[in-house]
């Protein structure tokens, strides 16, 4: 770092050349103007220059990192690089950030009549501790995002100043926001909402159809997004896309999107070993689609789903590992029930109700609820945990039976612990239906048996009391082509 001190200079010119520069102007107490030129990246410290009113870096082509400016600095122009600075002035300011992907933070309450132009590029206007005063009859405030995909912090916007924001395409919801009506932003056409950090809860309303949520930060606070007319619609859609960066990074969102029937999630990002997490609250949810190549942990808040409609969670196109927990989904009464599909990675699915599951490729784990279901593991060494799916009724005619469609070598079937004996039972002439077959199979306590009936294979684990009971467990394996000669049973886990 180069330190320059001139106690008498009123104007300073810096030519940034070479690869990059770091300059400290501490002690140049009389400086009122600073001109920056050159093509090198420059990091500048000038925060203690209490008389510095103007910074003109419009001729600079390198990235300018100016830090927090002094409260006296009210005129700032930067050039074509990716520039970063924080405004600390409370008076009227004039800012032109030029071209480049610039980031400007407001660290103070700027006065009415201020003009901020972010210029060309994908720019961001963030809130620090500052706000923007509304226009008055003789002082018009204009905040212009300019060309490009520009983002503004929602915490800077209120009913009084919303129309002053021009040409912004994205609204950042990271900082706490209380029920902002985005329809008030009449001079901007929003294309996206963003979560870039981890500061607090936010609520926005009147979000237009087609606007999505981009998640690059880690925010566990609730982000409530009220899409316009979703409460009365029957086929409303919303999408969440993770686009965070950094190896071994974590990105998360907790979204409330009540009224949305169709939710799509893209679990993506730039970097290796990225882990994304999404929590969903949506009382109308019927279809949730997952794509992307990054790991995603998905869960739900209580009350999500509509009992009178079936629900499908379709992650079959995803190549990142999916961890899906349906514990808090509403119990679906529609005959279509709950369907879960996952993709080609090693996925884990935890169920709270009867479900149909196709786990795709990968070494997957399916954890059934007490209501059982029909489960397909797909290619890979899969684990089917049906230990909670007990018969539930001492009458075998009314017993719960879960189905595994593709149990094969390398897979694990986890049942109740019923001793380590696994043997075939031969059906007698007394067996005339499935109920009587189950009765015969459960005669002896603390053993697990298998038999074939009606073109399928059944496994029955007795709970320790002779005779079929509610605590026994029955599983149907689709088809009869199973070779149990080398099968092992230990602590309720059956391995082929």
Descriptions of predicted regions:
Residues 1-496:
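Solvent-exposed, low-complexity segments and loops of surface/extracellular structural proteins
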